[in-house]
Amino acid sequence: MIKRLATFALLAALLSPALAFAQALTPGVDYVEVSEPQPLDPLNGKIEVVEVFGYWCHYCAEFQPLVGAWKAKLPADVRFTYLPAVYGGDDPYARAFYAAQGVKGLFARSHDAVFRAVNTSRDLPRNASVEELAGFYAQYGVDAAKFAQAMRDPKLDPKLARARDFAVKVELPGTPTMIVNGKYRILGNSYKDMLRIADQLIAKERKALR
């Protein structure tokens, strides 16, 4: 009897990941449907996953190692996009995000480091100025004065407005938030649960494309 129970326990342990993935998604619990669905960018046959985040968000900093590893393993038909959370006013961190994307390789080198500087080492305050951020990014090979100028460039204004509009459209409740194809805003009860739900919604959208 004990041997049989042990066998059942082993089988349950082996099957539990598959069962968790196969668990049917529940609207209102696992995700909500966006009332006016629209992807951030044209899909062109891709499945879009957007993570709305803030460098000043402690939860986003906790989520980043998980979502970064998950993103690295996504198949070619999935397009992952980071999108800074822009609320009412201007946000220097959002401007720094877009300015960093304008310099080849800078975003990849600095993204995780900004999270750590704000949320772990406290080298950057949550309400950092343009000058403070430019000085930080200078550690990664850019001229601080030129980076500050790039952050203030009016050409970034439409990008911030676009991020703000997207947040309104998906009724952003906070950060981090993941949205699939502009249609599904992921809920979940943990960071890993958010990724589980994302995987299933990606599979759902992939099936719909066939």
What residue ranges belong to the model's regions?
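C-terminal cap of thioredoxin/glutaredoxin-like
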Residues: 2-5, 54, 138-210
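Alpha-helix N-cap/helix-start motif
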Residues: 60, 90-93, 126, 160, ...
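Sec-exported extracytoplasmic/periplasmic mature domains
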Residues: 62, 68, 72-79, 101-105, ...
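Structural microenvironment flanking redox-active thiols in thiol-disulfide oxidoreductases
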Residues: 74-103, 107-138
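Solvent-exposed loop/turn segments at secondary-structure junctions
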Residues: 55-59, 86-90, 116-121, 156, ...
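Extracytoplasmic thiol/disulfide redox context detector
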Residues: 2-89, 168-169, 205-210
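Extracytoplasmic/secreted envelope proteins and their assembly/folding machinery
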Residues: 64-71, 93-97, 111, 130, ...
